[in-house]
Amino acid sequence: MNLPAHTALFTPSWHAELELGYGRFYDCTRPTQRRHKGPLRVQKHLYAEGPEVCQHIIVHPPGGIAGGDRLDISVNVGAHAWAQLTSPGAAKWYRAASPAFQQLELHVQPGATLEWLPQETIVFSNAQAELTTRIELHGDARLCYWDVVALGRPASGERFEHGHFQSHLDIRRDGTLLWHERQRIIGADGLLDSPIGLDGKTVFATLLLTGDVDSDLLEVCRSLSMPSPVRGNLTQLPGLIVARCLADEALHARAWLIEIWKRLRPALLGREAVMPRIWNT
């Protein structure tokens, strides 16, 4: 039976938790903690780049997040370890009669590196998605974090007409605020089509990478030629590079982020970019 767009789906809610820890042992990063509750877990760790970088793929078997669901993810990357976390596909926030929540707590210890590189988040019309991310960097810890959000499902003729998407992101280094952002997007809000908002685009994406690069590399990134219509730019803040873009499709936005990541990763993290194989499936 097909339900009209305004009808909420009533399903049992889940409270899922995932705790991950990583440590450096000689020249190898190894998982030191893996605890899960409910339908949230990681697949076997991989070493596509060799033993220094431990890659985990976070999976949520239900395939989507509905009203009343809550996902809590906690990650601690120990001193001098390197963890790269991604996902096998898009996270889908379904239409619902009540809010659903995701909370991330990410800690990166001195000398450690965390790459948080999930695939896109799709927010259905009538969804009530509320996300909170807190990241604490200690000492000279390094971070590469990105987020791709797609509102509605234009390919299916669904605009983001009802519901809301709410996001809160804090990044601190040794307790000092490095980046703070709050956003709340309401279905059918005028900012969705306004030139000072999303300007009719349905996808927005952000990449945050700690460190400083010279103006030449920034210009190289700004002048990237993309085969699809993506509007993006970069800003160098003290100790943090911010890259943002607007696009019509999540695939295009993610392709732009990947090209930026490929150029900035060697300069700031000291390793050539190797795309996780899961992105090609």
From Swiss-Prot:
Which Cys-Cys disulfides exist here? none
Q: Where in the cell is it found?
A: Cytoplasm
Known InterPro entries for this protein?
UreD
Q: What UniProt keywords are attached to this protein's entry?
A: Chaperone, Cytoplasm, Nickel insertion
Q: What superkingdom does the record give?
A: Bacteria
Q: Name one GO molecular function term.
A: nickel cation binding
**Which cellular component, as a GO term, is one annotated location?**
cytoplasm
Can you state the subunit structure given in the record?
UreD, UreF and UreG form a complex that acts as a GTP-hydrolysis-dependent molecular chaperone, activating the urease apoprotein by helping to assemble the nickel containing metallocenter of UreC. The UreE protein probably delivers the nickel.
Q: Give the protein's biological function.
A: Required for maturation of urease via the functional incorporation of the urease nickel metallocenter.
Assigned protein family: Belongs to the UreD family.
According to UniProt, the name of this protein is Urease accessory protein UreD 2
Q: Which organism is it from?
A: Pseudomonas syringae pv. tomato (strain ATCC BAA-871 / DC3000)
Specify the taxonomic lineage. Answer: Bacteria, Pseudomonadati, Pseudomonadota, Gammaproteobacteria, Pseudomonadales
